[in-house]
């Protein structure tokens, strides 16, 4: 016959076994879980009255019902000696960690038995590489058992006797709860932790504090889950080394021709905000630099050699940095081109929305903003501006023919102003290049010349002339134009200057120097506010700040909670010492006497550290394997070098013939 099962009383006081409400003298309360039990329905009730003071219920004492055990445990005999022996064997296994021992014992007692090692290895193989950062499961509310919302670390009271004076100190019990659930629990009149039943101090009841470290960790974990769930955005990017030599179109192009074409390979190694001529050292392909008179069939080809980078805009520049280049395309009727100098109109004032990209009507005034301000800044500082003339300028005798764009050297902006009427920003460009212009037969470049007479300056407004010496000027001693002041430092990086192998090594070095994995970011959120490292034995103060237990204790080492005082041989009343939190003015003197480790936070940190160590060990093994292959290649290098030396003359001849 199967013996009856032991059940406690329900919240209304009715015994769940006999279905009757026992009187108070026949009910017994557990000292751990504070659960009422019916004495008559207990299989082994306490024998004496003194035993009831420290009585533990069957659930807390571990007393089990003599029921038949299912599954694997069923074969261990009626008394359970075999089951106890199996548990002892698990405890004696030194190869298992405490967590693994607990898992095996739980499987054994639940009737599932011990999972075969082969099955565990198979599960590890299938889940390898797909293990998420399971942080949310460690941070669950003690009441609603859901993920924490506005987490509060619960503090409890315990007695502390010092100098024959009793204090009640509050310290975290290591359990967390949602702020809403905690306030609801307190509103029902409870003054104990929902997990360990320890008493909660009145200061926490009236003023609970949110643990910001747990908030940050939960937020990062949720971001990582969303990033894994959603598909990554497809970015169509082609590295400069992989681009063709000419502009190209892809299957994503909506229109034919160069309307939706992509730029070809950039042949010069200059940043996009480079000022002045392009020298030979920035031309690794031809080793001659950008020469005056070079021409191209379109703006995309002009871009590839760095003369003018924008595809559509006629001005390349930044309002806070200056203008690098302009294109003369005859877009305004007032533009005048005299070769060595010209009048240039700024941008703006036209409605170009929708299909009005070719609108030539000025709708409003131009102002010195954006590109116009960039030109004015180059005028103020005397920067050289690269000038490209287009065949679209039908009124200029200096424009190239045959639908080409031609690089005509560098110019300097001497003046800028606005004309009356519909105000337009105007700029006076004067040539200042060391190479002769394409339309002259001179063998030398420009020389300093007087400024031309511009009649419209008599009616100009907002006239601006350079007062200081220009950065790009003529050096009489060297008889050439050069930078008289240091050129402005570039604000944009040069892309793809290194070889592919060098770029790969550089990316790996940057990645190893700046780890930005989600686990590393989570560990960073769990740093101690004193040592600024990942916490060991984390403790949470009453003001919701987190520290290492050792750091906090060493911070107040040697400071007693009570300070004895005396005056003139008389003993005064003892005074309590004030120990302020390292992060705020809150007094944590009682807390420091016996800080309790926040177990939930400690488990998360330990798990993240373990996963990080596994990843580092895996990457180290891969690095050693790749290092071995590199060493083998280094051993073979002398043979390759001898072979290259024998073919040096042949390769040089081939290169020379190709250049011709």
Swiss-Prot record:
Zinc finger annotations (PHD-type) as residue ranges: 12-63
SMART domains the UniProt entry points to: PHD, RING, SRA
Comment text on domains: The RING fingers are required for ubiquitin ligase activity.
Listed pathway(s): Protein modification; protein ubiquitination
Domain YDG: 285-434
Catalytic activity entry: S-ubiquitinyl-[E2 ubiquitin-conjugating enzyme]-L-cysteine + [acceptor protein]-L-lysine = [E2 ubiquitin-conjugating enzyme]-L-cysteine + N(6)-ubiquitinyl-[acceptor protein]-L-lysine
Compartments reported by the entry: Nucleus
Coiled-coil zones: 593-622
SUPFAM superfamilies the UniProt entry points to: FYVE/PHD zinc finger (SSF57903), PUA domain-like (SSF88697), RING/U-box (SSF57850)
Protein name in the entry: E3 ubiquitin-protein ligase ORTHRUS 3
Region (Disordered): 107-129, 610-660
One Pfam family linked to the record: SAD_SRA
């Amino acid at each position: 016959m199967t013996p009856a099962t032991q059940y406690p009383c329900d919240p209304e006081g009715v015994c769940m076994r006999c279905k009757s409400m026992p009187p108070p003298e026949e009910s017994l309360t557990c000292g751990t879980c504070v659960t009422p039990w019916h004495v008559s329905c207990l299989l082994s009730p306490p024998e004496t009255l003194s035993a009831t003071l420290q009585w533990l219920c069957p659930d807390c004492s571990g007393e089990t019902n003599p029921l038949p055990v299912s599954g694997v445990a069923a074969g261990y005999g009626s008394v359970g000696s075999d089951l106890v022996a199996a548990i002892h064997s698990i405890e004696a296994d030194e190869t298992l960690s405490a967590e693994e021992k607990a898992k095996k014992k739980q499987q054994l007692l639940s009737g599932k038995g011990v999972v075969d090692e082969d099955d565990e290895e198979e599960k590890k193989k299938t889940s390898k590489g797909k293990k998420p950062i399971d942080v949310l499961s460690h941070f669950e509310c003690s009441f609603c058992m859901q993920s924490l919302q506005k987490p509060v670390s619960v503090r409890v009271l315990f007695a502390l006797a010092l100098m024959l004076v009793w204090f009640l100190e509050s310290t975290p019990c290591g359990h967390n709860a949602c702020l809403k659930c905690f306030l609801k629990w307190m509103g029902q009149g409870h003054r104990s932790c929902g997990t360990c039943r320890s008493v909660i101090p009145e200061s926490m009841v009236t003023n609970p504090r949110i643990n910001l470290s747990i908030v940050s960790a939960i937020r990062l974990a949720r971001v990582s889950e969303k990033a894994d769930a959603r598909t990554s955005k497809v970015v169509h990017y082609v590295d400069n080394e992989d681009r063709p030599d000419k502009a190209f179109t892809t299957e994503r192009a909506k229109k034919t021709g160069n309307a939706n074409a992509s730029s070809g390979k950039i042949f010069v190694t200059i940043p996009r905000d480079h000022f002045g001529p392009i020298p030979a050292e920035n031309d690794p392909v031809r080793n001659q630099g950008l020469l005056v008179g070079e021409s191209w069939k379109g703006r995309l080809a002009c871009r590839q050699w760095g003369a003018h980078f924008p595809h559509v805009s006629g001005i390349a520049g930044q309002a806070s940095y200056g203008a690098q280049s302009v294109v003369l395309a005859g877009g305004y009727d007032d533009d005048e081109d005299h070769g060595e100098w010209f009048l240039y109109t700024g941008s703006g004032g036209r409605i170009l929305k929708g299909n009005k990209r070719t609108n030539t009507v000025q709708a409003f005034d131009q102002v010195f903003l954006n590109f116009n301000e960039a030109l004015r800044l180059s005028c103020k500082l005397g920067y050289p501006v690269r000038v490209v003339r287009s065949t679209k300028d039908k009124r200029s005798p200096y424009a190239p023919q045959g639908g080409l764009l031609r690089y005509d050297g560098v110019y300097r902006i001497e003046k800028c102003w606005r004309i009356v009427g519909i105000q337009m920003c105007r700029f006076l460009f004067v040539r200042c290049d060391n190479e002769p212009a394409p339309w002259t037969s001179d063998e030398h470049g420009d020389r300093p010349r007087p400024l031309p007479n511009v009649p419209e300056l008599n009616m100009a407004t907002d006239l601006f002339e350079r007062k200081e010496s220009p950065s790009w000027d003529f050096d009489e001693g060297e008889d050439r134009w050069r930078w008289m002041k240091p050129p402005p430092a570039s604000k944009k990086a040069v892309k793809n200057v290194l070889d592919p192998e060098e770029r790969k090594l550089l990316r790996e070095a940057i990645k190893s120097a700046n780890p930005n994995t989600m686990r590393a970011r989570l560990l960073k959120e769990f740093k101690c506010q004193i040592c600024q490292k990942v916490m060991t034995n984390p403790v949470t103060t009453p003001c919701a700040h987190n520290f290492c237990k050792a750091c906090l204790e060493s911070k107040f080492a040697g400071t007693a909670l009570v300070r004895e005082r005396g005056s003139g041989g008389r003993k005064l009343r003892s005074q309590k010492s004030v120990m302020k939190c390292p992060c705020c003015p809150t007094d944590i003197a009682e807390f420091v006497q016996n800080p309790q480790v926040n177990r939930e936070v400690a488990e998360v940190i330990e798990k993240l550290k373990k996963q990080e160590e596994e990843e580092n060990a895996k990457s180290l093994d891969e690095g050693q394997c790749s290092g071995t292959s590199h060493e083998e290649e280094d051993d073979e290098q002398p043979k390759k070098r001898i072979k290259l030396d024998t073919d040096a003359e042949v390769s040089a001849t081939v290169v020379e013939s190709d250049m011709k």
